[in-house]
Amino acid sequence: MAQAADFVIPSAAYAEKDGTFTNFEGRVQRIRKAFEPIGESKPAWQTLTELGAELGLAFSYNHAEEVFHDLAKEVPAFRDLNYKKLGDQGLVWNKP
């Protein structure tokens, strides 16, 4: 498939990045990097931050936790959440 593409953006697999995910019931859980990304892969937040900088957009993140912090500020269901509150088991967010 990559041979047919004009460009390829390598993205890190779930075990290669830190961050969060939200499942179907609204449980928000941490994911923690188990090993370094392969080749030129990097977390999506990092790729989008770099692309945004090239486009002159005013956001700059250095870690997945900073992205989650901004998500919590902007999305009401995540408003009171942070990495510390999520702990090891995660939390179910308050559905509006």
What residue spans do the PLM features occupy?
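Non-catalytic alpha/beta scaffold blocks inside enzyme catalytic domains
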Residues: 1-81
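Segments of small-molecule ligand-sensing domains
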Residues: 83-85
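Short, intrinsically disordered, charge-balanced linker/junction segments flanking boundaries
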Residues: 89-96
